[in-house]
Amino acid sequence: MQTGLSLVCLVLLCSALGEAALRKTKKQAVVTDTGNSAKSDPEPVPIKTKGLKTLDRGWGEEIEWVQTYEEGLAKARENNKPLMVIHHLEDCPYSIALKKAFVADRLAQKLAREDFIMLNLVHPVADENQAPDGHYVPRVIFVDPSLTVRSDLKGRYGNKMYAYDADDIPELVTNMKKAKSYLKTEL
């Protein structure tokens, strides 16, 4: 009897706490406009969320992004599409410039959206194949569906082979096409 009563009390307490939390969340999510005395029933104004982060991180809202390298590898294999990994930093001027150029290029966006599993990372991954010549940013690495890093698809720099500049979008698009076309002949 004692255990049954304790269980009922616990359920009631959890339910009450859940209700209170829900009410508090609703109150915080809406700010009322009290400055206009002409309105009898104030309109709720949603609070603006500053710095809301999404998986695209500004690289293209229309593109479906995966969250982790492991998820990207699994989806690449499952969907028989290459994985394109963009390594960057949020506050790096070169990363920001490349991001703007990538978003502005319609063909790059179309290829990314339709033909690739896409991942952008702001932190290093454990797989050293993702940094064959260093951990610089921005760098773009392609991985085929057999989970092989495509070391043949490089940028134009000899000392940082997988680096791309904002002016290198045509080169990046060319490598995206190569990553896609080799896929059909290799598999």
From Swiss-Prot:
For whether the record's keyword set contains Transcription regulation, the answer is no
| Pfam families noted in UniProt | Thioredoxin_7
List the subcellular locations: Secreted
SUPFAM superfamilies referenced in this protein's UniProt entry, alphabetically = Thioredoxin-like
- Which InterPro entries does the entry mention? AGR/TXD (IPR051099), Thioredoxin-like_sf (IPR036249)
UniProt keyword terms in alphabetical order: Secreted, Signal
Which domain of life does the UniProt lineage start with? Eukaryota
Q: Which residues form the signal peptide?
A: 1-20
Provide a GO CC annotation, any one: extracellular region
The job of this chain, per UniProt, is described as: Probably involved in cement gland formation.
**Entry's family note:** Belongs to the AGR family.
Name of this chain's protein:
Anterior gradient protein 1
